[in-house]
């Protein structure tokens, strides 16, 4: 009788342990699949015709006229396959105006989806989403503003970087770098001045701080909000791998808001396997923000994206 009871208890315990192990394995397999999908989307995004690998120029505008085209008399020279005279970008009183070249705009040039005409080009400070794009052939141009400086960003769907792309380098997924962090909101939210790689800076709201434990020590990271409609927290950070295997300036991490919102204490998951390089890792023509002092961690985050090599 006692043997039967013991056997039943043993089988019940073994069954629960097996079920628990199966559930953990299923959860791990699901997470691994999520990471694989994330990495596939990451590479696909970079390879879009207007993705970061398509950047071929960043031309800072000086007051007055800046002519653009493939002819040698232009201030900004495009490759020979593009129109000889594309247009003139006139900067005056913090306003960029598109003017036609002497022989008129080239056939097929559109601005914001409409045929090109003389017009003021919108260039919001440190937010390029609403700026109208000039499109012709494989070219994509638009004005950007960084503080009181204006530039012309030039993309080409047939850029050398796109043609040479051979994939990204990643650490193997490691669940040890997927941590639950304590979220503490700031009330009111504070503002940090973010420096950039091109020597400018801009203010960004910091809604709170995430505190987490890793390898027996506690660390803190402050995220910013990229824009008022953001649904993800944006962490700009640097760790000790930046000096060896990852991009030297910083890496980015996007993570959803805490389940109970930004304005209440709570928790959120920081999956450092999703750390990604900033655009500046792939092109010298980006204007990437740098991490605030508190986001430079004295720990090796051997997870996520590694240095990119052409």
Regions found by a protein language model. Name each.
Residues 3-7:
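N-terminal export leaders
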Residues 10-19:
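Bacterial N-terminal signal peptides
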Residues 19-26:
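Boundary at the C-terminal end of the N-terminal hydrophobic targeting segment
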Residues 27-59:
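N-terminal pre-domain segments of enzymes
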Residues 135-202:
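Surface-exposed beta-loop interaction hotspot
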Residues 167-168, 240-242, 266-269, 273-310:
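Extended, aromatic/histidine-rich regions of cofactor-dependent oxidoreductases associated
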Residues 182-242, 247:
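Flexible, glycine-rich surface segments
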């Amino acid at each position: 009788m006692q043997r039967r009871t013991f056997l039943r208890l043993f089988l019940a315990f073994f069954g629960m342990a097996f079920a628990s192990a199966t559930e953990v394995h299923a959860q791990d397999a699901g997470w691994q699949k999520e990471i694989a999908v994330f990495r596939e989307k990451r590479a696909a995004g970079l390879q879009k015709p207007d993705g970061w690998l398509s950047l071929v120029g960043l031309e800072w505008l000086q007051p007055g006229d800046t002519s653009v085209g493939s002819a040698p008399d232009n201030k900004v020279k495009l490759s020979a396959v593009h129109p000889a005279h594309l247009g003139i970008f006139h900067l005056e009183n913090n306003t960029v105006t598109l003017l036609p070249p002497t022989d008129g705009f080239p056939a097929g040039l559109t601005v914001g989806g409409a045929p090109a005409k003389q017009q003021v080009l919108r260039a919001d400070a440190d937010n390029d989403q609403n700026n109208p794009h000039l499109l012709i052939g494989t070219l994509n141009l638009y004005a950007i503003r960084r503080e009181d400086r204006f530039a012309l960003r030039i993309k080409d769907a047939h850029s050398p970087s796109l043609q040479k792309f051979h994939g990204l380098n990643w650490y193997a997924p490691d669940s040890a770098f997927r941590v639950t962090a304590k979220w503490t909101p700031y009330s009111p939210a504070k503002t940090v001045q973010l420096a950039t790689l091109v020597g400018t800076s801009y203010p960004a709201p910091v809604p709170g701080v995430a505190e987490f434990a890793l390898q027996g020590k506690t660390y803190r990271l402050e995220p910013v909000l990229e824009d008022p409609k953001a649904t993800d927290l944006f962490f700009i950070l640097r760790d000790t791998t930046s000096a060896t295997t990852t991009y030297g300036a910083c890496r980015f991490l996007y993570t959803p808001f805490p389940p109970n919102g930004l304005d209440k204490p709570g928790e959120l998951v920081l999956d450092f396997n999703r750390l990604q390089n900033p655009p500046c890792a792939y092109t010298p023509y980006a204007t990437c923000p740098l991490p605030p002092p508190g986001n430079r961690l004295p720990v090796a985050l051997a997870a996520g994206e590694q240095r990119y090599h052409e």
